[in-house]
Structure formats: structure tokens, C-alpha cells
């Protein structure tokens, strides 16, 4: 009988399903940055997201629903109003009273956070308008993004390197930021400074899940179809070629397969995406890496270490626990 191996997926800043009992086992000590926290502070942590190029920044929430940040603060990504590093946890007062539903981050890094009420806040690196506030100035404090989203409730967020996606409760996708390869889905390669609804083939579809790669984007609709757009120089869109796709395009190779969710996981190769078909079965879009799926231009089945992989459905309540090496 095959051993079922739970695989916690998500882009480090992506939420992962967990129960209250598993929260008690969240070992933040796996991340060196938490050595700067006292034992008392560690015991209060309820959710945590470590990000940055070297894992030198962290945002965490406490059992009292307070939000704290800590780290090098590159480009103001801690949201404290300055670019000074801090070796002591500092409360993010600008988000007082807000409960974190989900968050993601980019390479700058920039941070996109959705609250339990469906509001979107962004801050950090903004050279490519990835904050969605209409400027290219770095955001030193969380900025409420309401343009084209004022009457929308955001339920999921995703970040590429320098672009951002959000999913609303009515199944619409909005994108903004760097667009050199069409990853915003606007049909052009001009950067997008404010949220813009992704339409085209998604116009009359109800999207239930979104994900970003470095310079590409993916969406799953309620019928189980997968749509992709953006950079595909390594075949990561799964369309059978290596040409960029400036608007959403259905992945025909997945015809007849009902996909539940898609993922971009930092434990997978740089250009990889995983589509969850059902427990124990998955398909992967992947760029040129060693192994039997290297350079695949169309989806391939995924098996890790000879064991059946179960991709956990994401909740929007808990930020990812650390990968265990």
C-alpha cells in the first residue's frame, strides 16, 4: 500500500490548511530569524510568514490578533514607515484591528495582504507598480488598495516576482504590476499601475483559485478548467510551446480533468506549478530542471520520492509553516 505523504504547499506567504491542534506544533524555530524573539513572544505566535531573499523578514500575528514584524526591512517591506531594520518585534499599528486572512509576497519584496473583511493592503518594493497604488514609489506603510476593488471582497491573493493578483468572492481576478511577459493578462506588455480585471477567456467564468509564478499567472475556474497567461519561455504554462501568453488561455492538455487548486511552491523548481486533481494525484507544469519532468511543455503527473502525494486544500486562515528540510 502506498504511503500518503502530506505536502504543505504555498509560496511561503500562501496559507495552508491546519487545525487548532496543529497550530500548537508550529515550530517557528525552524527559521533562524525567530531566535531574535523571546520565549514569551514565541508562545504568543498564531500565524507566521517569513519572507525576503534570505528569510530576513517576518510578519506574524498573535493569539491576541495583533500583527508584529521583524527583520532587515528591505524597501520598507515591514510596513513600519521607514527602512530601518529591527531586531525586536514591532507591532504594525497601521493594521490594528485587522485580522489577516491571507498574504503573499514578491521578490522586491512587496507584500499583498487581505483581511478577513476582504480589504487589500500592500506595501514594500514598488518599482514596477506591483503595489497597485498608481505610483512607482516604495510603500513604507500598508496602503489600502480600493481602486476598482471598492465594492469587492477579496478572498485570495498571489504575488509573482513583481506583479500581484487578487481573487474576489464573486469569482473575478484583478491583476497589476510588472507586465513584460503579459503576466497581468491585459493583452499588452505595458506595466499595470492599478488593479485591472483579468477578462478575455475569464470574462464569464467563476474563478475559485489563483496562483503566480515568477512572471506568469494561473487561475482555476469552478468547472475545474485551468487558465494560464504570462511568461512561458520554459514551457511552464503547459500550452505545448514556449511563446508568452498575454491573455488567459485554457490548458487544453488538462481537458477532462477537474482541477481543484493550483500552486506555486518554493520547494519545487523555480518555474514549476502544481495542479491538484484529487487526493493522491497531481500534475505539474515545470521548466528545465533535472529529472523526468525537466523541460516539460505540457502537464505531467507528479510523484515524489516514489510516494503518493496529497496536496492539502488551502484555507485562508493560516500562513504557511516552515518547510522541513
Functional labels for PLM-detected ranges:
Residues 52, 82, 96, 104-105, ...:
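Conserved loop/turn at the beginning of each blade in beta-propeller domains
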Residues 39-42, 49-51, 93-95, 104-105, ...:
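Surface loop/turn motifs at the tips and blade-to-blade linkers of beta-strand repeat domains
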Residues 56-60, 69, 109-113, 122, ...:
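Conserved core positions of repeat-based scaffolds
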Residues 63, 72-74, 107-108, 115-117, ...:
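Conserved strand-to-loop turn within each blade of WD40 beta-propeller repeats
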Residues 2-39, 68-86, 125-139, 174, ...:
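Short glycine/serine- and acidic-residue-enriched loop/turn motifs that recur at repeat junctions
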Residues 116-119, 140, 151-156, 163, ...:
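Tandem repeat domain/solenoid detector
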Residues 40-65, 74, 110:
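Beta-strand-rich domains and repeat architectures in extracellular enzymes and scaffolds
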Amino acid at each position: 500500500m502506498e504511503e500518503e505523504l502530506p505536502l504543505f504547499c504555498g509560496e511561503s506567504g500562501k496559507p495552508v490548511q491546519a487545525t487548532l491542534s496543529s497550530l500548537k506544533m508550529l515550530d517557528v524555530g525552524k527559521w533562524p530569524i525567530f531566535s531574535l524573539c523571546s520565549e514569551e513572544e514565541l508562545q504568543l505566535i498564531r500565524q507566521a510568514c517569513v519572507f525576503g531573499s534570505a528569510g530576513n523578514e517576518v510578519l506574524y500575528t498573535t493569539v491576541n490578533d495583533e500583527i508584529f514584524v521583524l527583520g532587515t526591512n528591505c524597501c520598507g517591506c515591514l510596513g513600519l514607515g521607514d527602512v530601518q531594520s529591527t531586531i525586536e518585534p514591532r507591532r504594525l499599528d497601521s493594521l490594528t484591528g485587522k485580522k489577516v486572512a491571507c498574504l503573499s509576497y514578491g521578490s522586491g519584496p512587496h507584500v499583498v495582504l487581505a483581511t478577513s473583511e476582504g480589504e487589500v493592503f500592500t506595501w514594500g518594493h514598488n518599482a514596477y507598480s506591483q503595489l497597485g497604488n498608481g505610483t512607482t514609489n516604495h510603500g513604507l506603510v500598508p496602503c489600502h488598495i480600493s481602486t476598482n476593488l471598492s465594492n469587492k471582497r477579496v478572498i485570495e491573493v498571489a504575488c509573482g516576482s513583481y506583479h500581484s493578483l487578487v481573487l474576489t468572492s464573486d469569482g473575478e481576478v484583478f491583476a497589476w504590476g510588472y507586465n513584460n511577459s503579459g503576466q497581468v493578462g491585459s493583452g499588452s506588455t505595458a506595466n499595470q499601475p492599478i488593479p485591472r480585471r483579468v477578462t478575455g477567456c475569464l470574462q464569464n467564468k467563476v474563478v475559485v483559485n489563483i496562483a503566480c509564478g515568477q512572471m506568469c499567472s494561473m487561475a482555476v475556474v469552478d468547472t475545474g478548467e485551468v487558465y494560464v497567461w504570462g511568461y512561458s519561455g520554459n514551457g511552464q504554462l503547459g500550452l505545448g510551446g514556449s511563446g508568452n501568453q498575454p491573455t488567459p488561455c485554457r490548458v487544453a492538455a488538462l481537458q477532462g480533468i477537474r482541477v481543484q487548486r493550483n500552486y506555486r511552491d518554493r520547494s519545487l523548481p523555480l518555474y514549476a506549478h502544481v495542479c491538484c486533481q484529487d487526493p493522491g494525484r497531481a500534475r505539474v507544469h515545470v521548466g528545465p530542471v533535472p529529472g523526468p519532468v525537466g523541460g516539460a511543455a505540457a502537464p505531467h503527473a507528479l510523484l515524489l520520492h516514489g510516494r503518493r502525494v496529497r496536496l492539502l486544500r488551502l484555507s485562508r486562515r493560516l500562513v504557511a509553516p516552515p518547510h522541513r528540510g
